[in-house]
Curated annotation (Swiss-Prot):
Main subcellular localisation: mitochondrion
Protein name: Small ribosomal subunit protein bS18m
Single annotated GO MF: structural constituent of ribosome
Assembly mode: Component of the mitochondrial ribosome small subunit (28S) which comprises a 12S rRNA and about 30 distinct proteins.
Record carries keyword Amino-acid biosynthesis: no
One Gene Ontology cellular component: mitochondrial small ribosomal subunit
Gene3D superfamilies to which the protein is assigned, alphabetical: Ribosomal protein S18
Subcellular localization: Mitochondrion
Length: 143
């Protein structure tokens, strides 16, 4: 029994890979159990049949691209700028509505303000000439 305690006291050490224990069943025959840390009783699989198949993520949404990232925004292009203001109040739509990136949203806002100050665009409403233009963004108006 002292040999068993001496052997099992070293189980916590990192370099020990084998441990043996003796168990007796009512004083009859001793059974020894051998445990090895990095070994299993099954053979290692050398083929790739159990590995997962590499594939694209089917739930990944396509990246949203900014509509105006490759375009130049000018304060004199009133028809383009009027797409980003409300037809009823003249308020500039935010990023969550227009879907623009932050840089282009700032450029659009500055261009609209500049066009309104210079008299190219009305301030309080959208110009009626541009009400039936095709929409650049997915902006839904109440009807």
């Amino acid at each position: 029994m002292a040999a068993l305690v001496a052997l099992c006291s070293g189980i916590g050490r990192k370099n020990l890979t084998t441990a043996a224990g003796c168990f007796t069943d009512r004083g009859t025959q001793a059974v020894s159990v051998i445990w090895r840390r990095c070994f299993s009783q099954f053979e290692q699989v050398t083929s790739n049949e159990d590995l997962p198949v590499p594939m694209e993520n089917p739930y990944k949404e396509p990246l949203k691209k900014c509509v105006l990232c490759e375009k130049r925004v000018d304060y004199k292009n009133v028809q383009l700028l009027s797409q980003f203001i409300s037809p009823f109040t003249g308020c500039i739509y935010g990023r969550h509505i227009t879907g623009l990136c932050g840089k282009k949203q700032r450029e659009i806002t500055k261009a609209i303000k500049r066009a309104q100050k210079m008299g190219f665009m009305p301030v309080t409403y959208k110009d009626p000439a541009y009400l039936k233009d095709p929409r650049v963004c997915n902006i839904r108006y109440r009807e």
